[in-house]
From Swiss-Prot:
This is Methionine-R-sulfoxide reductase B1. PROSITE patterns: MSRB (PS51790). It comes from Bos taurus (Bovine). Binds 1 zinc ion per subunit. Truncated MSRB1/SEPX1 proteins produced by failed UGA/Sec decoding are ubiquitinated by the CRL2(FEM1C) E3 ubiquitin-protein ligase complex. Belongs to the MsrB Met sulfoxide reductase family.
Length: 116
């Protein structure tokens, strides 16, 4: 929590419905609800991305263990990845701003993938 500024309005912090989280700016798939977990920080936390290129990463030179992440498609700022700070040993914690995400419920995700 010390690496991010908290402005409130984190609507996805305690949101655990099945579905996917996409970039609010371009709609690119970022995180699955299966990788989301409860964390004490005020931001939604995820252990992994949907695709290897879902996020672009840039080191935080003044913050060891913190990496700035942005959308892998459009560059929209998403938050941070904290190395080895996930729920299991060796996992990362992606600390993501709710305002940078749009949620697509599982039912809509299935319909969209079937071309409906």
């Amino acid at each position: 929590m010390s690496f991010c500024s908290f402005f409130g309005g984190e609507i996805f912090q305690n949101h655990f419905e099945p579905g996917i989280y996409v970039c609010a700016k371009c709609g690119y798939e970022l995180f699955s609800s299966r990788s989301k977990y409860a964390h004490s920080s005020p931001w939604p936390a995820f252990t992994e991305t949907i695709h290897a290129d879902s996020v672009a990463k840039r080191p935080e030179h003044n913050r060891p263990g913190a990496i700035k992440v942005s959308c892998g498609r459009c560059g929209n700022g998403l938050g941070h990845e904290f190395l080895n700070d996930g729920p299991k040993r060796g996992q990362s914690r992606f600390u993501i701003f709710s305002s940078s995400l749009k949620f697509i419920p599982k039912a809509e995700e299935t319909s969209a993938s079937q071309g409906q």
